[in-house]
C-alpha cells in the first residue's frame, strides 16, 4: 500500500498487485512517447525523478516545496509565500499575547527542516525559535521565558517547528521517538512544551497551529517570479 503523504517512498517494492511501480511508470512514459518528464515537488517527487532517471529516462525536476530543503538548491518556490503567511500569523499573535499576558507557541510546518520556522520566527519577532536541526533544552526555554517575565515583558512568542525534539529524544532513533510519542498520544512536541512551560514557570501558555494555511492561497510576487524563471 502506498500512502498519499509519501506516495513514492516504496516505489520499487512490489505490492499486492504484483506491479513494480517504477517499471509501470517507465512503460507509461514510453507508451506516451515523451521526450522528457517535468516534475514539480519536494523530496518525494525528486526521489521518484531520480528513480526514473536511473531507468535512462529524460527527467527535469523543479524544486517546489514550502520546506526549502531540496539538496543542491538555494531556494524553492512556495517557501517565500509560506514564510509570509507564517510571519503574518506570528505578527497577529503578538497582540493577543500582550493583551492577555500569555506565552504563545506557534507551531509551524517543517518535520525535518526548520527553514520555514527560522525565517518566519526572525521576521515575526519571535522570542524563541525551536527547529529540528537543534534539539532543545526545556529548562533553557523556561529560563528564557522567566527572564523576559522578570524584566517586565508580560508575554513571549515561541515559534516551534512541528518536527522539533528535545535533547533526550535526540538520543533515540527516529522510530523510537515516534513510538514513544504515539504511546503518549502526541504527534508533535508543541503541546508538551506548552504544558512544561506552564508547570515550570506558572505562566499561562497556549498553542496556535496555522497548519495547512501555509500551503495554500495566492503565491507571493517573489515566488511568482522565481517559478517563471525556473520555467524559461
PLM ranges: what are they?
Residues 7-8, 42-45, 57, 62-69, ...:
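Short, ordered loop/turn segments at secondary-structure junctions
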Residues 185-232:
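C-terminal non-catalytic interaction/assembly regions of soluble proteins
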Residues 5-59:
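N-terminal glycine-rich phosphate/adenylate-binding segment common to multiple enzyme folds
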Residues 72-83, 218-224:
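Short beta-strand elements at the ligand-binding edges of bilobed clamshell
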Residues 28, 36-41, 47-51, 58, ...:
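Accessory alpha-helical/coil subdomains and C-terminal extensions
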Amino acid at each position: 500500500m502506498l500512502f498519499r503523504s509519501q506516495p513514492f517512498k516504496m516505489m520499487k517494492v512490489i505490492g499486492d498487485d504484483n506491479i513494480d511501480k517504477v517499471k509501470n511508470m517507465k512503460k507509461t512514459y514510453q507508451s506516451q512517447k515523451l521526450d522528457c518528464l517535468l516534475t514539480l515537488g519536494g523530496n518525494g517527487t525528486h526521489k521518484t525523478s531520480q528513480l526514473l532517471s536511473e531507468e535512462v529516462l529524460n527527467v527535469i525536476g523543479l524544486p517546489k516545496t514550502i520546506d526549502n530543503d531540496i539538496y543542491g538548491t538555494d531556494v524553492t518556490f512556495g517557501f517565500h509565500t509560506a514564510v509570509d503567511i507564517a510571519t503574518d500569523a506570528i505578527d497577529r499573535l503578538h497582540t493577543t499575547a500582550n493583551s492577555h499576558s500569555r506565552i504563545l507557541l506557534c507551531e509551524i510546518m517543517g518535520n525535518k527542516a526548520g527553514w520555514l520556522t527560522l525565517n518566519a520566527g526572525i521576521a515575526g519577532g519571535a522570542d524563541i525559535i525551536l527547529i529540528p536541526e537543534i534539539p532543545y533544552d526545556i529548562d533553557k526555554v523556561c529560563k528564557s521565558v522567566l527572564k523576559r517575565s522578570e524584566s517586565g515583558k508580560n508575554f513571549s512568542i515561541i515559534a516551534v517547528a512541528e518536527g522539533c525534539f528535545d535533547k533526550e529524544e535526540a538520543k533515540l532513533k527516529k522510530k523510537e521517538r515516534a513510538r514513544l510519542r504515539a504511546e503518549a498520544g502526541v504527534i508533535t512536541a508543541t503541546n508538551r512544551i506548552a504544558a512544561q512551560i506552564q508547570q515550570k514557570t506558572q505562566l499561562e501558555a497556549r498553542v496556535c497551529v496555522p497548519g495547512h494555511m501555509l500551503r495554500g492561497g495566492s503565491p507571493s510576487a517573489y515566488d511568482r517570479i522565481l517559478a517563471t524563471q525556473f520555467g524559461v
